[in-house]
C-alpha cells in the first residue's frame, strides 16, 4: 500500500491544545510512515495534518520553491490589503492569470497562485498562502499532482488531499464557499487524460454532496465536439490556457461568484 493512502486528518471540535506536533529525524533511505508538516489551531477546531513521505529527504522537495515563488508570496502578503471578495490560489494556471482583477470586476480578488505548486506543497504552506487575507470565497486550481512526474499521486490519493483542504478551510473560514476548478485536459499531459477524467468525476460527485463546496467545470468548454482539446485556448506549451482560455473561465466563474456574494454584475 502506498504511503499517501495513509494520509491522516484529525479533527476535534472545541479543543484547547498547546504544544507542538513532533516528527523524528530519519536518515536517508530510512522508511517512515509520515512526517508531520503542519498544525492549525482555530477557535472552532484543531486540525493536525500529516503528509506521508517515503524518505526524510522528501522535505527538500517540498521546500523546493521556498526561496523563490513562495518567498514572493510572503513579500506580497506584507503589503497587500487583506480584505477581498475572493482569494484565488493553486498552481501556475492561477498565477499566470494576469487579467484576473479585470476579468472578475467588480469583485475584489487576490491571486495567491505559484508556479509548480502541488497540493502537497500547499498543505505545507497553508498559512503562507492564505496569510491573513480575509476573503468571502475561495477558488482553487491545481493539477500538478497528476502531472506526469515521478511523484504523481493516484486520483483517489489526490482526492484525500482535497478533502483535507476542505476541512482546513471550513475550520478557519466556516461560512465561506469553496470553488474547485476542474482539471483541464491538455495535450501536454495526454498520457494522464484518463486520470484527469476520473479525478474530475470524483470531485464533481463530492461537491454535489458537500455543503459549501462547488465543482466548476472549466474543462468541457475548452474541448472540441469530439472531446479533443481545442488548442486555440492554449499557449504554445499546450499546457497553460491563453487569454482566450481565461476568458472562457471568466465567463463561467464570474457570474457564479457574483451571485454567491450578492454583488451586481455592473
Model-identified regions with their sequence ranges:
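Catalytic nucleophile-elbow at a beta strand-turn-alpha helix junction centered on a G-D-S/GDSL motif
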Residues: 83-99, 117
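Catalytic His-Asp segment of secreted/periplasmic serine-dependent ester chemistry enzymes
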Residues: 185-266
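Charged helix-capping and loop-helix junction motifs
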Residues: 155-163, 195-200
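N-terminal secretory targeting modules
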Residues: 1-10, 16-86, 102, 260-266
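Generic structural signal for well-ordered alpha-helices
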Residues: 126, 162-167, 200, 204
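A short helix->loop->beta-strand "cap" motif at the edges of active sites that frequently abuts
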Residues: 173-177
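Short amphipathic alpha-helices and their capping/turn segments at secondary-structure boundaries
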Residues: 75-86, 124-132, 167-170
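Oxyanion-hole/transition-state-stabilizing segment in secreted/luminal serine hydrolases
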Residues: 94-110, 121-159, 179, 183-187
Amino acid at each position: 500500500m502506498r504511503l499517501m493512502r495513509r494520509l491522516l486528518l484529525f479533527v476535534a471540535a472545541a479543543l484547547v491544545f498547546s504544544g507542538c506536533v513532533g516528527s523524528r529525524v530519519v536518515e536517508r533511505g530510512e522508511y517512515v510512515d509520515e512526517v508531520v508538516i503542519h498544525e492549525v489551531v482555530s477557535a472552532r477546531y484543531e486540525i493536525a495534518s500529516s503528509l506521508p513521505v517515503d524518505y526524510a529527504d522528501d522535505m527538500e522537495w517540498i521546500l523546493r520553491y521556498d526561496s523563490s515563488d513562495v518567498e514572493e508570496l510572503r513579500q506580497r502578503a506584507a503589503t497587500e490589503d487583506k480584505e477581498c471578495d475572493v482569494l484565488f490560489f493553486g498552481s501556475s494556471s492561477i498565477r499566470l492569470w494576469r487579467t484576473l482583477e479585470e476579468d472578475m470586476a467588480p469583485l475584489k480578488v487576490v491571486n495567491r497562485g505559484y508556479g509548480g505548486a502541488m497540493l502537497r506543497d500547499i498543505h505545507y504552506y497553508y498559512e503562507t498562502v492564505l496569510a491573513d487575507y480575509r476573503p468571502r470565497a475561495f477558488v482553487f486550481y491545481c493539477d500538478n499532482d497528476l502531472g506526469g512526474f515521478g511523484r504523481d499521486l493516484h486520483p483517489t490519493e489526490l482526492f484525500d488531499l482535497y478533502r483535507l483542504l476542505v476541512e482546513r478551510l471550513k475550520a478557519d473560514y466556516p461560512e465561506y464557499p469553496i470553488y474547485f476548478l476542474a482539471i483541464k485536459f491538455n495535450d501536454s499531459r495526454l498520457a494522464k487524460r484518463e486520470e484527469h477524467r476520473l479525478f474530475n468525476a470524483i470531485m464533481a460527485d463530492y461537491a454535489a454532496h458537500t455543503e459549501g463546496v462547488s465543482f466548476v467545470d472549466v474543462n468541457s468548454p475548452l474541448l472540441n465536439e469530439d472531446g479533443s482539446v481545442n488548442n486555440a485556448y492554449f499557449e504554445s506549451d499546450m499546457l497553460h490556457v491563453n487569454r482566450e482560455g481565461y476568458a472562457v473561465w471568466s465567463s463561467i466563474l464570474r457570474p457564479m461568484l457574483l451571485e454567491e456574494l450578492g454583488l451586481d454584475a455592473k
